[in-house]
């Protein structure tokens, strides 16, 4: 694994930056879940070796995933936790911190490994998002913006869409989002179960 590989954060959040309530998502959007799976699973087919993406998550995020969907299939799952006795099952990596997780990936999926890493995604929760936003390798946010005022008790740590951060974070064109994702993505607002939401991609220079 190339130690210069960047990090991508993927998150669904309200316009007031709410991301959760009572250790779960306060919305259930099947199309958004499908988008998350496509984005975090996509690997270019022209690679001559087997490649996989990584999903990094905190313990609470891991535990919030229904048992039948754990681990997230077709992706390398890494759980950030200080609980060394946590039983994650075979093939699931654990690490004490974001940097420790990256070191583990460098060691495990080096040039001699039969599996190479394509992209590294940070998928939550709030504490890991904060660590990722502070990390020098984080250069991309795949954001699902939910246009509904929903009560949340957990919030994203940085208001990257606000004017005060416009010199750092830039919203990319939809065509660039599709190019990066590798497939067609609905443009503009989507309505599902009374929720309007939209897919965006934001980047910053490293």
UniProtKB/Swiss-Prot annotation:
Record-listed substrate binding positions: 32-37, 75
GO cellular component terms given for this protein: mitochondrion
Catalytic reactions on record: (6S)-5,6,7,8-tetrahydrofolate + NADP(+) = 7,8-dihydrofolate + NADPH + H(+)
Residues annotated as binding NADP(+): 12, 18-24, 59-61, 81-83, 124-131
Pathway noted in the entry: Cofactor biosynthesis; tetrahydrofolate biosynthesis; 5,6,7,8-tetrahydrofolate from 7,8-dihydrofolate: step 1/1
Keyword Ion transport set for record: no
Hydrolase in keyword set: no
One Pfam family from the record: DHFR_1
GO term, biological process aspect, one: tetrahydrofolate biosynthetic process
DHFR domain segment(s): 6-204
Molecular function per GO: dihydrofolate reductase activity; NADP binding
Alphabetized UniProt keyword annotations: NADP, One-carbon metabolism, Oxidoreductase
InterPro entries found in the cross-reference section: DHFR, DHFR-like_dom_sf, DHFR_CS, DHFR_dom
Assigned EC number: 1.5.1.3
Family, per entry: Belongs to the dihydrofolate reductase family.
UniProt function note: Key enzyme in folate metabolism. Catalyzes an essential reaction for de novo glycine and purine synthesis, and for DNA precursor synthesis.
Protein's UniProt name: Dihydrofolate reductase
Natural source organism: Pneumocystis carinii
């Amino acid at each position: 694994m190339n130690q210069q590989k960047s990090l991508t954060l993927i998150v669904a959040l309200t316009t007031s930056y709410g991301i959760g309530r009572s250790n779960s998502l306060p919305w259930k959007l099947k199309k958004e879940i499908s988008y998350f799976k496509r984005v975090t699973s996509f690997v270019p087919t022209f690679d001559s070796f087997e490649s996989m993406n990584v999903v990094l998550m905190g313990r609470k995020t891991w535990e919030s995933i229904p048992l039948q969907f754990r681990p997230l299939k077709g992706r390398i799952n890494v759980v950030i936790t200080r609980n060394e006795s946590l039983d994650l099952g075979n093939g699931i990596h654990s690490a004490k911190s974001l940097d420790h997780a990256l070191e583990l990936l460098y060691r495990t999926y080096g040039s001699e490994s039969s599996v190479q890493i394509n992209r590294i995604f940070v998928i939550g929760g709030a504490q890991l998002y904060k660590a990722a936003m502070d990390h020098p390798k984080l250069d991309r946010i795949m954001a699902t913006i939910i246009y509904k005022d929903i009560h949340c008790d957990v919030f994203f740590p940085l208001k990257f869409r606000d004017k005060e951060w416009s010199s750092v974070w830039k919203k990319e064109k939809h065509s660039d989002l599709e190019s990066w994702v590798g497939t067609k993505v609905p443009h503009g607002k989507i309505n599902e179960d009374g929720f309007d939401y939209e897919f965006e991609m934001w980047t910053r220079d490293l």
